[in-house]
C-alpha cells in the first residue's frame, strides 16, 4: 500500500490530513517533528509515495529535513506551511520540494 508521510508539529492539522489521506484508501503515518519524520521515512522507505512537510517545527525546520531527505531519497515532497514569503517558496523548490503550498 502507498504511504503518505505527514511531518508537522500541529497535531490537529496532522489528524485532519491523516483522515483525508485514509479516505483515499492510502496509508498515512504522522511525525510531529523533523527528526521523527526522518526516522519514519527510513522505516517506510519502501512504501512511502509522498511526504507532506511543514517548514516551521521546533526540533529541525522543514528546509533542513528536506535537505536530509534529498541526500537519500527522491520521494515527492509537498511543503505545506504558513510561511508565504516568495523567498521561502524559492528556497523550498531549490532544495528539491516538488511543490510549495501555503496554509490559510
Residue spans of the language-model regions?
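Two-component/phosphorelay signaling modules centered on CheY-like receiver
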Residues: 11-29
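Residue-level signal for the "D+5" position in two-component response regulator receiver
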Residues: 30, 59-60, 86, 94
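Conserved phosphotransfer cores of two-component systems
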Residues: 42-46, 68-75, 95
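Receiver (REC) domain active-site loop signature in two-component systems and cognate sites
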Residues: 55-57
Amino acid at each position: 500500500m502507498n504511504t503518505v508521510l505527514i511531518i508537522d508539529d500541529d497535531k490537529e492539522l496532522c489528524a485532519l490530513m491523516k483522515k483525508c489521506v485514509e479516505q483515499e484508501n492510502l496509508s498515512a503515518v504522522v511525525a510531529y517533528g523533523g527528526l521523527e519524520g526522518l526516522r519514519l521515512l527510513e522505516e517506510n522507505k519502501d512504501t512511502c509515495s509522498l511526504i507532506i512537510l511543514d517548514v516551521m517545527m521546533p526540533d529541525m525546520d522543514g528546509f533542513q529535513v528536506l535537505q536530509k531527505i534529498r541526500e537519500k531519497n527522491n520521494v515527492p515532497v509537498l511543503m505545506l506551511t504558513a510561511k508565504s514569503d516568495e523567498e521561502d517558496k524559492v528556497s523550498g523548490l531549490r532544495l528539491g520540494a516538488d511543490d510549495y503550498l501555503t496554509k490559510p
